[in-house]
Amino acid sequence: MKQYFMGIDIGTYESRGMLIGEDFRVTAEHTVAHGMSHPRQGWFEHDADKVWWGDFCGISRHLIEAGGIAPEQISCIGASTLGTDCLLGCDCVPVDEHCRPLCKAILYGIDSRADKEIQWLTRHYGRDVRRLFGHPICSGDTATKILWIKNNEPEVYRRTYKFLTGSSFITAKLTGR
């Protein structure tokens, strides 16, 4: 039975996927646009279930159908998500023990709600962070988002089992862990 590789990228404004055969030829491609929530000045969010997981599942179904293959023929899945580079930072979503998002995901460095938390972290850890990571604390750092949730959404923080990036969220949904 011929095997296939599937890759899906969840981006800021769209998600795209590709199914590639053993011969490294593209069997199917699919792209879907999605929105981004901007509820307040400087805030940028995604609904992790709807956008990240929903797009992942929808694109997967489309690729399998368009490729005319059985799901069992997929031997490898690669997933990438928005804002996971060093320059822009990571997105962050708090989840409960069943991987259910407790609020909207805070996007990578484009979300600037955590200014007070950046200042606090810089006062307390700035010198060490710059030495260890080569850059000052910024809005893209996951720690700023976690501290913002702790300070501004204490009930969400209290109920949080884990804070996940987009890639971690997709992995947790796929594996159940």
Specify the residue positions occupied by each region the protein language model found.
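N-terminal glycine/serine-rich phosphate-binding loop of ATP-dependent small-molecule kinases
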Residues: 1-104, 131, 159
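Gly/Ser/Thr-rich active-site cleft segment
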Residues: 2, 10-12, 88-89, 95-98, ...
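Short, surface-exposed amphipathic charged segments that create phosphate/polyanion-binding patches used
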Residues: 45, 120-125, 177
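Conserved donor sugar-nucleotide recognition element shared by glycan-biosynthetic enzymes
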Residues: 56, 114, 142
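Pocket-flanking alpha-helical
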Residues: 94, 116-120
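Carbohydrate-associated surface elements
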Residues: 111
